[in-house]
Regions:
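Alpha-helical support elements that line or immediately flank enzyme active sites
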Residues: 1, 85-107, 210-234
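Short, charge-patterned binding micro-sites
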Residues: 2-18, 247-251
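Beta-strand segments within the central parallel beta-sheet cores of soluble alpha/beta enzyme folds
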Residues: 2-3, 50-54, 166-170, 236-245, ...
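Short glycine/threonine-rich loop-to-helix capping motif typified by GTGT followed
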Residues: 19-21, 174-188, 244-256
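Glycine-rich anion/phosphate-binding loop at the beta-strand->alpha-helix junction
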Residues: 144-230
Length: 256
């Protein structure tokens, strides 16, 4: 997040005692991640003047004892996970979600190649009316030619939307200050975007920052794999798989 003193990054969580992750390791990982995702420093988030805190702690002994087993590893927490697939797209993902992801991928390429663009952006696609509505917000330099940018983004959208569309580019107007300087970031805040979009229910757990013992991640991936194979083998047009677990138990409580 941005601060008055140049920015702050807090790395927290619980890890296995055998991981042997040092503070130097954390600093290296953080700096590498930031350099991949941020081009421009701001007064309140300066890549060369950050305060980086390592607050990783050992995992609870109660959780470790419940999860670790020589034969069957137990689930790292309780939870409900959802996997989904549809034959409406080649990726087996919901159509508007698939379109938005493809637009975002092309936009990412443009951002990395154009010195007038920074790397903060998001895409929203909705359909159901006469036109497909596409909202794109992308961070830029103050001196950018917005007419040129609109043309470039319109071309990206037209390559991914087959029907007639309406593009709303940077509806807030100027978007110069972005990334952690513009918004406080936190892992797990966008679980619907990380999954399938709003047309498919989510179990509630985030994917990021978790090892495979955390079924929020591993069981969600397994449920998606099962749903995708059911649709790919033409056993259904759409498939939603739901699975639930209790902490410490190797077998799911429910699979539907």
């Amino acid at each position: 997040t941005g601060t008055k003193n140049g920015g702050l990054v807090l790395v927290g969580g619980e890890i296995s005692e055998i991981a042997e992750i040092t503070t130097d390791d954390v600093l290296t990982i953080v700096k590498e991640a930031l350099n991949k995702t941020i081009k421009t420093s701001f007064e309140d988030f300066d890549l060369d003047n950050l305060s980086i805190y390592n607050e990783l702690t050992p995992q609870s002994e109660e959780i470790r004892a419940a999860v670790e087993d020589d034969e069957d590893q137990g689930a790292g927490d309780q939870g409900i996970m959802v996997g989904f697939a549809t034959n409406k797209t080649k990726s087996f993902m919901p159509p508007t979600f698939d379109i938005s992801r493809n637009i975002q991928k092309s936009l990412w390429d443009l951002q990395n190649s154009d010195e007038m663009l920074d790397l903060d952006s998001k895409v929203q696609v909705t359909s159901g009316g006469e036109k497909t509505k596409v909202v794109v917000s992308t961070q830029h330099n103050k001196a950018i030619d917005m007419e040129k940018l609109f043309h470039e983004v319109s071309e990206i959208v037209s390559n991914n939307v087959e029907s007639e569309f309406e593009l709303d580019l940077n509806p807030s107007g100027s978007f110069v200050k972005g990334g952690p300087a513009g918004d406080t970031g936190l892992t797990g805040r966008k679980i619907v975007v990380d999954a399938y979009g709003p047309s498919v229910p989510v179990g509630g757990g985030a994917f990021s920052g978790k090892d495979p013992s955390k079924v929020d991640r591993s069981a969600a991936y397994a449920a998606r794999h099962l749903a995708k194979n059911i649709v790919a083998h033409k056993l259904a047009d759409d498939c939603l798989v739901r699975v639930s677990y209790a902490i410490g138990k190797a077998e799911p409580y429910e699979l539907t």
